[in-house]
Design a protein with these regions (language model features):
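Topology signature of small-to-medium multi-pass alpha-helical membrane proteins
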Residues: 2-176
Length: 176
């Protein structure tokens, strides 16, 4: 799928979700929407920094755990045992850390545009929400996921998308 086709698909999805949220019986009052728009850049900046810090901390923790497992196995073999400790840090763990880092970068990139009330910033939040949703579905198929994780991801994504689309009209598109 090329870049233009992907963009077309995302725009179509955005339009459908916007209509779906607008058709819901409960809409946020305009005053609440304006308050969210006012604080959104700062919330996004905080979450972006926190996400990058968490990704780094988890990456470092995973590396330390891997080294500890290797050391435990080496010591076990030296004293006549077998390597009994097994690292359970699969591709899913590393993928989760990478997704967290990418989301953090998206949030940081969104900050200036959100502050200027540009739709490009809103788009980055939308892409981050979609990335989180896709990651939640992928996690269904490994040891760290499961149906409970999928349900939590779907619920969190639905709530996040609801608020995101409630404020969508407050962001202006770039002039062509």
């Amino acid at each position: 799928m090329g870049g233009k086709e992907m963009s077309k698909q995302l725009n179509g999805l955005e339009t459908k979700l916007d209509k779906t949220v607008k058709d819901l019986p409960f809409q946020l009052p305009e005053k609440s929407r304006k308050a969210i728009v006012e604080y959104m850049p700062w919330i996004t900046l905080f979450i972006g920094v926190l996400s990058l810090w968490a990704a780094y901390a988890l990456w470092n923790l995973a590396r330390v755990a891997d080294r500890f497992i290797d050391l435990s196995n080496s010591l076990s073999k030296i004293y006549g045992g077998e390597g009994v400790a097994r690292g359970n840090l699969t591709l899913a763990v590393w993928l989760g850390i990478a997704v967290l880092a990418v989301e953090g970068v998206l949030y940081l990139l969104a900050f200036p545009a959100l502050k200027a009330k540009k739709k490009a910033g809103w788009n980055l939040l939308f892409y981050g929400a979609l990335l989180n949703l896709v990651h939640g579905v992928v996690m269904l198929f490994n040891d760290y996921g499961g149906v409970g994780r999928l349900f939590t991801t779907l619920l969190g994504s639905a709530i996040g998308m609801y608020f995101l689309f409630q404020i969508r009209s407050h962001y202006t598109a770039a002039k062509k």
